[in-house]
């Protein structure tokens, strides 16, 4: 038996299999994509609104509509409750409302929360291209890590949340920390989010920004913040990332 010939045949067959698997996967220059969480990967609005209103009701305060809560989110729980509570932090019951929100959301944060349609498929296609993926959120750090693990198992290399050692978004600290952990440069990184805060975060971090309009902010809000790349669907975002 000609073993040299057999080895060459096996290698050619292996190469054919690899080529077939890679067929249709466009080469990407982007090495890492960092994602905002709420309104970008996960639709958390219904649970956030329910917990906000449970906290307000517990303090005898008027409740908020889901559209109001949509406008309030994006800067962490403190800002959400500051905007939802009448007179904000000046209200003597603010801390009680804040604590009530934390307790309710801790027990009900996953009642209705789900990934947006098409997100999982998009993440899997990016992973297949060798792109590193990370989450950066203003949610508390341990919650971000739990949500990353539970909703996106095996997909995220890094998950970074709010921590006393770092400034929260729109400061670049969390994005830069995620980049450090992944070992990528600014030129290799894209940040994706659904809000004006995310657009500013990407600008402050010195990375390319792709905004999405399926989340908590309008297209006009994103444009006003300076977004020049806005995707309406995960499929459109994938094509946008491939073109960079």
Where would I find each of the regions flagged by the language model?
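A metal-dependent, Asp-based hydrolase signature
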Residues: 74-107, 117, 124-125
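Structural recognition of alpha->loop->beta junctions
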Residues: 152-159, 222-241
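Substrate-recognition/cap helix-loop segment adjacent to the acidic, metal-dependent catalytic center
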Residues: 57-59, 63, 80-88, 112, ...
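Short, positively charged and aromatic/hydrophobic N-terminal segments
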Residues: 2, 15-17, 24
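Acidic, Mg2+-coordinating phosphoryl-transfer loop and its flanking beta/alpha structural elements
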Residues: 190-231
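Active-site neighborhood of HAD-like aspartate-dependent phosphohydrolases
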Residues: 28-71
């Amino acid at each position: 038996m000609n073993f040299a010939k057999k080895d060459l045949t096996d290698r050619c067959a292996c190469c054919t299999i690899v080529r077939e698997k890679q067929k249709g996967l466009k080469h990407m220059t982007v090495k890492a994509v960092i994602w905002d969480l709420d309104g970008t990967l996960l639709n958390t609005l219904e649970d956030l609104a329910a917990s906000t209103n449970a906290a307000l009701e517990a303090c005898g305060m008027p409740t908020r509509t889901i559209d109001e809560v949509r406008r309030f989110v994006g800067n962490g729980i403190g800002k959400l409750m500051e905007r939802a509570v009448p007179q904000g932090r000046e209200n003597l019951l603010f801390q009680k409302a804040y604590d009530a929100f934390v307790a309710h959301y801790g027990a009900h944060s996953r009642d209705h929360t789900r990934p947006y349609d098409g997100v999982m498929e998009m993440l899997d296609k990016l992973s297949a291209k060798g792109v590193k993926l990370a989450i950066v959120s203003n949610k508390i750090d341990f919650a971000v890590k739990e949500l990353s693990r539970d909703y996106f198992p095996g997909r995220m290399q890094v998950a970074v949340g709010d921590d006393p050692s770092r400034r929260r978004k729109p400061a670049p600290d969390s994005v830069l920390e995620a980049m450090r952990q992944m070992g990528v440069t600014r030129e290799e990184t894209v940040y994706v989010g659904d809000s004006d805060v995310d657009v500013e975060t990407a600008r402050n971090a010195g990375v390319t920004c792709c905004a999405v309009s399926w989340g908590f902010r309008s297209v006009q809000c994103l444009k006003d913040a300076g977004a020049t790349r806005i995707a309406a669907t995960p499929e459109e975002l994938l094509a946008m990332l491939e073109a960079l």
